[in-house]
A protein has these predicted regions:
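FMN-binding flavodoxin-like domain, especially the glycine-rich phosphate-binding loop
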Residues: 1-85
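Generic anion/oxyanion-binding catalytic loop in active/binding sites
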Residues: 41, 92, 123
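Active-site-proximal loop/hinge segments that shape catalytic or ion-binding/gating pockets
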Residues: 161-166
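A mid-sequence, solvent-exposed acidic-amphipathic segment
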Residues: 73-106, 110-111
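Short hydrophobic "strand-cap" motifs at the C-terminus of beta-strands
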Residues: 131
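Generic secondary-structure boundary/loop-capping signal
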Residues: 18, 158-160
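Iron-sulfur cluster-binding cysteine motifs and their immediate structural context
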Residues: 98, 108-128, 139-156
Length: 168
């Protein structure tokens, strides 16, 4: 929390409280990372569902000074050292590739991009804009119904995850 507050203060943002939810794993951009197995995914979603109501009550009651965050192993190392490697070398759209034979031009990948870093080319195929705004969130990858999007060789054989409201 201390590092988070410091970073926010540098950006001119005052942090009064901090609450986090542990959600299913969706980052698949490194060789040793994949989506959670179904039982872990369901367990995390059930836990988040229980915590979310409590968090909503805290927010609605305007409670200040709340700190309920999940801190992983080696937070300083992960945040400062590995975080800088991610920011400078891994968070990019240059590794994304489209398999045009699999693509059905549905546009789900384009619509799912939270930073509007994709558009359709003149043939209707999705393309990355290479503007430096890509978050490497993999929303495009996870929302593709035909698995036409790949991140180099790093996503070969890996799972997909995205939340659907009625998913059990």
């Amino acid at each position: 929390m201390k590092m988070f507050k410091q970073d926010c203060e540098k950006a001119g943002i005052k942090v009064d409280s901090c609450i986090s939810l542990l959600m299913p794993e969706s980052y698949v951009g490194l060789p040793f990372m994949d989506v959670d197995k179904k039982e872990n995914e369901l367990r995390k979603k059930e836990q988040a569902k229980r915590e979310l109501q409590d968090f909503a009550d805290t927010i609605m009651k305007n409670v200040h000074g709340t700190e309920r965050i999940h801190i992983g192993n080696w937070p300083r190392t992960n945040t400062r050292f590995l975080g800088n490697i991610f920011l400078n070398h891994i968070i990019t759209d240059k590794h994304f590739r489209l398999n045009e034979e699999k693509c059905i031009k549905c546009g789900r990948c384009i619509k799912s991009c939270p930073v509007a870093n994709m558009s359709a080319d003149s043939n209707g195929f999705p393309q990355w804009l290479h503007t430096g705004s890509c978050l490497s969130c993999f929303a495009c990858y996870h929302h593709c119904p035909t698995r036409a999007i790949e991140f180099g060789m790093r996503t070969k054989g890996k799972g997909q995850y995205y939340y659907t409201k009625n998913e059990k």
